[in-house]
Swiss-Prot record:
Keywords: Membrane, Mitochondrion, Mitochondrion inner membrane
Compartment(s) where it occurs, according to its Swiss-Prot or TrEMBL record: Mitochondrion inner membrane
Family membership: Belongs to the cytochrome c oxidase VIII family.
Pathway entry: Energy metabolism; oxidative phosphorylation
BP GO terms, sorted: oxidative phosphorylation
Source species of the chain: Thunnus obesus (Bigeye tuna)
Regions that span the bilayer: none
Function: Component of the cytochrome c oxidase, the last enzyme in the mitochondrial electron transport chain which drives oxidative phosphorylation. The respiratory chain contains 3 multisubunit complexes succinate dehydrogenase (complex II, CII), ubiquinol-cytochrome c oxidoreductase (cytochrome b-c1 complex, complex III, CIII) and cytochrome c oxidase (complex IV, CIV), that cooperate to transfer electrons derived from NADH and succinate to molecular oxygen, creating an electrochemical gradient over the inner membrane that drives transmembrane transport and the ATP synthase.
Protein name: Cytochrome c oxidase subunit 8A, mitochondrial
Subunit record text: Component of the cytochrome c oxidase (complex IV, CIV), a multisubunit enzyme composed of 14 subunits. The complex is composed of a catalytic core of 3 subunits MT-CO1, MT-CO2 and MT-CO3, encoded in the mitochondrial DNA, and 11 supernumerary subunits COX4I, COX5A, COX5B, COX6A, COX6B, COX6C, COX7A, COX7B, COX7C, COX8 and NDUFA4, which are encoded in the nuclear genome.
GO cellular component: mitochondrial inner membrane
Membrane-topology annotation of the record: Single-pass membrane protein
Keyword Membrane: yes
């Protein structure tokens, strides 16, 4: 379970994928 919202997780993943 993550301590931060799913929105932040998705943004982090996108970013990583985009970059």
């Amino acid at each position: 379970v993550h301590g931060k919202p799913a929105t932040i997780d998705h943004f982090a993943l996108i970013x990583v994928s985009y970059f």
